[in-house]
Amino acid sequence: SGQRMAIDASLIEADANKQYSAPKDEWDAARVDRGAAPRAVKEYLDTLDEAAFGAATPVQPKFTSFSDPASQWTAARKGPAFFSYSDNYLIDTDHGVIVDVEATRSIRQAEVGSTKTMLDRVKAKFDLRPERLIADTAYGSGPMLGWLVDRKIAPHIPVIDKAGRSDGTWSRADFEWDAKNNQYICPEGEALKQFRRNYSDPNRGPTGKGVAKYQALKHTCQACPSKPKCCPKADCRKITREEHEDAREVARAIRKTDQYKVSAKLRKKVEMLFAHLKRILGLGRLRLRGPCGANDEFLLA
């Protein structure tokens, strides 16, 4: 039906070895002789500016393979590190059918970015736009959730949230968001505002972009009986709000529904397809090198 889709990625070992690699302080792509380089190295140079490979992150890998430099050195399996590519699946959960496949570097930024690529490609080729997208926490960043909500796709995805506190004091979740007045309301009923004045120049006011800071009045917090539960070490309480916080709240609200429980079960169908790929088809290690070789093998499998 194409209404409920799920996405995930799995590591596939590349045809590369640590013995034939260079540490990051000895690797320089600018020194590679393109004329004498093999196909896999030329493809690496061609994809340095692509979001799925070279441009996914400015951080250089710890090691780079001479034979397949586009592969990613990773220890994501909690064991010995190895060179790999990520096989990204977009599936229709109602029928367990793979709708699209994309090969990327084995880092979260590239895997999450492939989601946008595959959803746009499926829309262009098959005119499919899912009602919901199911994924794990790796895909729960603010920009990703905002991208989905803007396209009217319900994010059935756990939110990456580091606002929780372990010392027993109130976290951001304990404060109520008042969208109409652009402020937070604390459990004691006091307002935390971003600005407490009207600017004659609109360019100095709130922009709605980046991280916004909301703060209570100092004398209000000092006289509050709940200050030990709120901000025991600060003069007043401050809360930050991300640019895509509205989309994150949409995802949090979805997580409380019964439909989310159904989606959590449907997500397992992606893992079943990866198990079939590795155990039945035996694709635990790639035979071809380079981004194109990895993509071709993933498509054929």
Give, region by region, the residue ranges found by the protein language model.
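Anion-binding and metal-coordination hotspots
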Residues: 1-301
